[in-house]
């Protein structure tokens, strides 16, 4: 999504990437989101329970949502529908102003700034392989 920012995993191992991103494997992806109105308890509950996306004719899976600012929240998804967070917010009556992926499974963005990169550590790779070993591609 060109309107998003944050963590990207780059690899020559397509099978690994498929296992990570495949919705049926329920791997966590975490985002920080800024919207155009205050984050309320009602909004959090609706998002957490799953939201009906009429464009895709599907209800999103339950997810974890936590308020981190007046108009900001953190969301952890185990699904990867196209523009899912933007569509969920739209269905709840708000617009996404900023969307940043901060974690994919055990790999976090940390303090990296836009344009910076780092190699995944041996420990992170070992844990990643352990988590995806039962996953389907």
Language-model features: locations:
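Basic, flexible Lys/Arg- and Gly-enriched helix-loop patches that mediate nucleic-acid binding at interfaces
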Residues: 2-137
């Amino acid at each position: 999504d060109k309107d998003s920012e944050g963590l990207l995993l780059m690899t020559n191992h397509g099978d690994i990437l498929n296992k990570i991103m495949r919705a049926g494997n329920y791997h966590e992806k975490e985002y920080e989101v800024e919207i155009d109105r205050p984050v309320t308890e009602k909004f959090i509950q609706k998002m957490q329970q799953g939201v009906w996306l009429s464009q895709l004719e599907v209800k999103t899976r339950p997810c974890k949502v936590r308020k981190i600012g007046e108009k900001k929240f953190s969301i952890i998804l185990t699904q990867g529908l196209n523009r899912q967070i933007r569509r969920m917010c739209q269905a709840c009556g708000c617009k996404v102003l900023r969307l940043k992926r901060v974690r994919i499974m055990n790999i976090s963005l940390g303090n990296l700034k836009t344009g910076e990169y780092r190699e995944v550590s041996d420990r992170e790779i070992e844990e990643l392989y352990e988590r995806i070993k039962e996953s389907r591609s």
